[in-house]
């Protein structure tokens, strides 16, 4: 009896052998489940990656557009501040000439012009005083020859105002982009124009080096003529958007003509424009779209890598 009882216990402890058909059935069921769940999982992962990429791209694009607009605003403020500062200096010189008696004393006037010659490097050649006969007074150290003074833009514009203001941009004899600040002197006995020429080199420096957004670039355009006044690419300066064969610049010209200051995407660049107060100038700032989305592209690559690893683990575990 004891022997039979022991045998019964041993029989109970023995695992029943699976029938080959049962084993095949279970493997087939697992394969079917995996065949259904794996595609669904892959679709879900792809959808999640696409959603994450889209949301991240929109957020980064929005943030970058705001940063580009801020950068253009800061540059525009710097250009306007420079123009206002130089114009204030011209007004100070005008006030000094009028209230020191220099407008009625030729010797004192000549001395003043000599003193102001080295006032500021931005004032190319110092200051000029031109009468209605076309006679020009200038600093003794200024060797520039001025012919047909009455035909010069600074003379013609100066006749229209007492308070000094800027002329449109013009090229000097050496093909440098210049502007003049000019206005009539307060002299009851003689009509005379006070003027000075300013180089746009300082403006060019602001346009090229004061971009706060990494990877962004700017150029300054005269809206009335389409001429490029400042650019990091020196070969573009003094060329016209109206004559360009560059597709991007053509689209920029259209944007300027429409007075469109919104942030827009032109070809492969995000672009914003800003008008410079008191001038016909428009600052154009732009950044490659690829530079903005590069961080999102890196995130997408990481997500895809994680997804692939996760799918492999999921497949192996099932």
Locate each region found by the language model.
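N-terminal sensory and localization modules of signal-transduction and trafficking proteins
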Residues: 1-27
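Juxtamembrane interface helices immediately C-terminal to a transmembrane segment
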Residues: 34-35, 52-82, 101, 105, ...
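Extracytoplasmic/periplasmic sensor domains and loops in membrane signaling proteins
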Residues: 107-111, 140-171, 234-263
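Conserved beta-strands of PAS-like sensory domains
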Residues: 174-209, 229-233, 272, 282-291, ...
């Amino acid at each position: 009896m004891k022997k039979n009882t022991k045998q019964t216990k041993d029989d109970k402890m023995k695992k029943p052998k699976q029938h080959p058909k049962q084993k095949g059935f279970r493997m087939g069921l697992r394969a079917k489940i995996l065949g259904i769940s794996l595609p669904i999982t892959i679709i879900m992962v792809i959808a999640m990656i696409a959603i994450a990429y889209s949301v991240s791209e929109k957020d980064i694009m929005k943030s970058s557009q705001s940063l580009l607009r801020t950068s253009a605003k800061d540059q525009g403020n710097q250009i306007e501040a420079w123009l206002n500062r130089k114009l204030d200096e011209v007004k100070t010189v005008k006030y000094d000439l009028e209230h020191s008696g220099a407008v009625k004393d030729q010797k004192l006037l000549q001395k003043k012009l000599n003193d102001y010659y080295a006032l500021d490097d931005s004032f190319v050649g110092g200051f000029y005083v031109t009468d209605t006969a076309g006679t020009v007074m200038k600093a003794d150290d200024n060797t520039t020859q001025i012919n047909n003074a009455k035909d010069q833009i600074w003379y013609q514009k100066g006749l229209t105002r007492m308070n000094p203001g800027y002329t449109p941009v013009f090229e000097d004899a050496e093909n440098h982009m210049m502007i003049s600040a000019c206005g009539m002197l307060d002299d009851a006995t003689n009509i005379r124009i006070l003027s000075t020429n300013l180089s746009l080199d300082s403006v060019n420096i602001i346009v090229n080096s004061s971009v706060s957004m990494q990877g962004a670039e700017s150029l300054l355009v005269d809206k009335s003529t389409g001429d490029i006044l400042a650019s990091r690419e020196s070969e573009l300066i003094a060329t016209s958007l109206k004559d360009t064969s560059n597709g991007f610049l053509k689209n920029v010209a259209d944007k300027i003509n429409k007075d469109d200051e919104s942030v827009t995407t032109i070809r492969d660049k995000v672009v914003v424009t800003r008008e410079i107060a008191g001038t016909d100038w428009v600052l154009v700032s732009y950044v490659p779209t690829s530079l903005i989305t590069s961080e999102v592209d890196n995130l997408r690559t990481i997500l895809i890598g994680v997804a692939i690893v996760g799918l492999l683990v999921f497949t192996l575990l099932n």
